[in-house]
């Protein structure tokens, strides 16, 4: 945990573990987590990396005996909502309960990034639905057209011929 967290308040000077083994173990756990965190999104990875750096900096061993009680320290700070933080064991740090992942796109958007109004979005949706319906209603005629299209038939014949040739070649070599 950095010393300028939580709205610029001074964080307590946390006790660092004197034994180098404990230091190694705690940072090793985080490293391991980071290594296997392929499924995490970028911001989670960044948080994990940040936690790892802080662990290596000042070994935040809040759960261990002898470390200052963070909640006690927090309760003495003016203007801090004490319920807004929770201890995240996997990161070994205190995080805000409100930190939810951001939604990547606004609910209504076009590819240009200009927001469409809900009415426009509804109209677009209806249009897509009607297109889908049209396709499903006329699917068989479409498929028949495709099946009887001379170009496609020629292509399929070529493909079949090519496959047969390949089969013959491999058979020849196997004998």
Curated annotation (Swiss-Prot):
Residues 1-32, 156-175 are annotated as: Disordered. Residues 14-24 have a biased composition (Low complexity). It comes from the Bacteria. This is Uncharacterized protein MPN_143. The lineage of its organism: Bacteria, Bacillati, Mycoplasmatota, Mycoplasmoidales, Mycoplasmoidaceae.
């Amino acid at each position: 945990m950095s010393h300028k967290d939580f709205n610029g308040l001074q964080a307590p000077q946390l006790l660092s573990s004197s034994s180098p083994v404990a230091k190694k173990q705690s940072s090793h756990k985080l490293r391991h987590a980071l290594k296997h965190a392929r499924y995490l999104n970028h911001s989670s990875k960044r948080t994990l990396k940040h936690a790892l750096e802080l662990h290596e900096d000042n070994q935040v061993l809040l759960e261990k005996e002898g470390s200052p009680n963070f909640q006690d320290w927090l309760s003495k700070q003016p203007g801090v909502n004490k319920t807004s933080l929770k201890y995240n064991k996997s990161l070994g740090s205190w995080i805000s309960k409100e930190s939810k992942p951001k939604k990547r796109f606004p609910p209504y958007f076009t590819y240009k990034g200009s927001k469409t109004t809900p009415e426009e979005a509804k109209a677009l949706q209806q249009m897509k639905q009607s297109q889908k319906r049209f396709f499903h209603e006329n699917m068989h005629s479409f498929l028949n057209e495709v099946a009887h299209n001379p170009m496609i038939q020629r292509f399929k014949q070529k493909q079949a011929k090519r496959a047969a040739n390949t089969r013959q070649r491999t058979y020849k070599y196997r004998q």
